[in-house]
Amino acid sequence: MDKKAIFDSVSNMEEQIGELYQQLGDLKTNLGEMLEENNRLNLENEHLRRRLSLTDEGTLEPVAEEEAVHGVMAPNRKEAMQQMIELGEGYDNLVQLYKEGFHVCNVHFGSPRGNDEDCLFCLSLLNKK
């Protein structure tokens, strides 16, 4: 092979590597978005399962039409929600999410933490309890 052919071959490889790097970056972005969405859906699913179990137990009334349409809670529902909040379930959920490698701070909420590095914002939030 002459020098020009070798140079062209190396240039071609460089372009291919650049394209692969771009594809890898796109895949990484898509994966991050999918992880965030999966996390959000898991939380929503868990919340709905708890709500269903509370409804089945009679602790929580089914959602009234007014609440569904206008976002206004019935008085009994407010009391039940207040009891759940007082139990610290939300805090426990945040701790679990943080242990699973996700941000719980308002700056990066739901996004994966890189290499399980600690986030000062998350830690300050979790230590407020």
From Swiss-Prot:
Record keywords, A-Z: Cytoplasm, DNA replication, DNA replication inhibitor, Metal-binding, Zinc
Q: Which annotated residues bind Zn(2+)?
A: 103, 105, 119, 122
According to its UniProt entry, this protein's organism is Listeria welshimeri serovar 6b (strain ATCC 35897 / DSM 20650 / CCUG 15529 / CIP 8149 / NCTC 11857 / SLCC 5334 / V8)
Spans through the membrane? none
Kindly provide the name given to this protein in its UniProt entry.
Replication initiation control protein YabA
Q: What does this protein do?
A: Involved in control of chromosome replication initiation. Inhibits the cooperative binding of DnaA to the oriC region, thus negatively regulating initiation of chromosome replication. Inhibits the ability of DnaA-ATP to form a helix on DNA; does not disassemble preformed DnaA-DNA helices. Decreases the residence time of DnaA on the chromosome at its binding sites (oriC, replication forks and promoter-binding sites). Tethers DnaA to the replication machinery via the DNA polymerase beta sliding clamp subunit (dnaN).
Tell whether Transmembrane is among the UniProt keywords. Answer: no
- GO cellular component annotations of the record: nucleoid
Pfam families named among the record's database cross-references: YabA (PF06156)
SUBUNIT field: Homotetramer. Interacts with both DnaA and DnaN, acting as a bridge between these two proteins.
Per its Swiss-Prot or TrEMBL entry, what cofactor is needed?
Zn(2+)
**Out of the domains of life, which is the source?**
Bacteria
| UniProt record similarity statement | Belongs to the YabA family.
Cofactor annotation remark:
Binds 1 zinc ion per subunit.
- Keyword Zinc listed: yes
Q: According to its UniProt record, where is this protein located?
A: Cytoplasm, Nucleoid
Picking any one GO biological process from the record gives:
DNA replication
- InterPro entries, alphabetically? YabA
